[in-house]
Amino acid sequence: MQLSTDDILALYGFCQELARSAGAIILQGSKAILEQKGKQDHGVNEKKNAVDLVTEWDVRVEEYVKAKIRENYPAFSFIGEESYSAGEQNPITEIPTFCVDPIDGTTNFVHGFPYACISIGVIYQKSPIIGVVYNPFLDQLYHGLKGHGSYLVSPLHPTPLRLPLSTPGPFRSLSEAQVGVEWGSDRSKQVMEAKSRSYARLAGDGSQKGKVEGGRMIHSLRSLGSAALNFVNVASGGLDIYWEIGCWPWDVCAGVVIAQEAGGLVGGSSETPITGIVDENILTGRKYIVIRGIGDTPEETGLDAQKRLIKEFYETVEDWAPN
């Protein structure tokens, strides 16, 4: 199926409107869950373990989104977190595909921590071209279209602000970085120990005084609890790097577009060449790294700096197979 420029622009607008209307349902769900907190039937269930949560509102939002898509784009394919969990496991094909996480940051949503969002991506010719991430709690809408930039709309800035929010500066070393990481839902001994060692090397003092072997002593580690919000914070410049193993395409698809259009570089596993192209293999590979845009210097282009820092990062952390 071929899409014209006008088709893609209309699709881009549709995704933004859909995210906002779905966001209203998320807010309704948050209110309902917080009112039921402490009761036996509070609408929160477990998937594979006690920290992999799903609520009736995740399902409701996804069903609402699917219905709107069927009504407006019946020929498109659909990949969604809750549909996938229920057995609807559509592959990425040449058919234009919506890739949706109805509530990214469900644990935050359940606890009333206002960092949850809906993430809507569109894959065309097996590559992400549209990304919309909306946090209804903060009324922040991030959106990007391949080749047209990415933007933030918020109550403070009702006119779209181009991302990143400030001119990208140089980035000489990992020691200058604020890095987004997550504990995730796989709490097995192997994964916890690998993450703990990785985080210790990133944050630890590797000097003779600090004695953390391989320590990079970065500025900080941050966990927002949402892959999509980590991606858009790299796009805006609030995070320098985000790295995670274990996410799924619906977690990252929209964020990939928004980050790339802000000058970010997205890659897969440590073995995957960093080309700047996010294809099906990276989207479904469940290992992701994104680094913010970096300004050119007389000594080094921004792209060369991004690749150098990703290499330095992967020399610091450990790898493992996602469950």
PLM regions with names:
Residues 168-225:
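Short loop->beta-strand "edge-of-pocket" segments that line small-molecule binding or catalytic clefts
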Residues 22, 26, 58, 69, ...:
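Residue-level signal for inorganic ion chemistry
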Residues 2-23, 197, 210-323:
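Oxyanion/phosphate-interacting regions
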Residues 91-162:
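DPxDG-like acidic metal-binding loop motif
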Residues 130, 178, 240-241:
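Short, Asp-centered acidic motifs that coordinate Mg2+ and/or phosphate
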Residues 1-103, 315-323:
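N-terminal subdomain of lithium-sensitive/metallo-dependent phosphomonoesterases centered on the IMPase/IPPase/PAP
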Residues 157-173:
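Conserved beta-loop-beta connector loops within the AMP-binding
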Residues 150-152, 156-160, 186-188, 295-300:
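Short helix-loop capping/hinge motifs at secondary-structure junctions, enriched
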